[in-house]
């Protein structure tokens, strides 16, 4: 029931000049083998009508082969149990893949952390957040060209992709520029 009512918000970000980089077959293969969508979350902002910081988070998780959907709400009063509601249900891998593919249509930013390479995806950050973990260990410091290869591959799936690192920022998707004018 909660699932059927979910709607993907319209991505809200400016179109910038695109850079194009064709990924090598070897790199794309390695990337695909190590790319998993581990968590998808809708984050709904406060309820302005009631003036309460009411939030609803619908979160998809995939861990150890088990896919779950969790719906959690809060009306902003952290002192009462009645103000919070949480329910988790197990969903099939097919349902999980269908939802994550449908939702994966927004700005993508790239970060590196101690656990691997983490892609955090934002469309309208006030509405929702999608996080994609790329479990990939490189035997060398990842280069700018390799980072472009990664994000360019994702852009071929039909998403507007941004790559952000500590040292530089790229927007590497170009195929939908004309359609969006």
Language-model-detected regions and their locations in the chain:
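Phosphate-end processing signature that detects enzymes handling 5′-triphosphorylated RNA
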Residues: 1-181
């Amino acid at each position: 029931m909660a699932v059927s009512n979910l709607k993907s918000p319209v991505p809200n970000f400016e179109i910038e000049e695109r850079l194009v980089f064709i990924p090598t077959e070897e790199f794309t293969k390695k990337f695909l083998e190590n790319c998993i969508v581990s968590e998808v979350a809708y984050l709904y902002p406060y309820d302005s009508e009631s003036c309460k910081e009411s939030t609803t988070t619908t979160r998809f998780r995939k861990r150890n082969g088990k896919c779950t959907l969790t719906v959690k709400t809060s009306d902003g009063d952290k002192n009462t149990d009645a103000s919070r509601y949480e329910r988790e249900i197990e969903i099939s891998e097919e349902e999980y893949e269908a939802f994550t593919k449908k939702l994966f249509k927004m700005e993508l930013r790239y970060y590196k952390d101690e656990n691997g390479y983490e892609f955090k995806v934002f469309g309208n950050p006030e509405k929702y957040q999608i996080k994609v973990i790329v479990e990939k260990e490189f035997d060398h410091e990842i280069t700018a060209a390799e980072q472009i290869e990664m994000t360019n591959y994702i852009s071929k799936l039909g998403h507007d992709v941004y790559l952000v690192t500590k040292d530089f920022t790229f927007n590497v998707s170009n195929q939908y520029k004309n359609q969006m004018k």
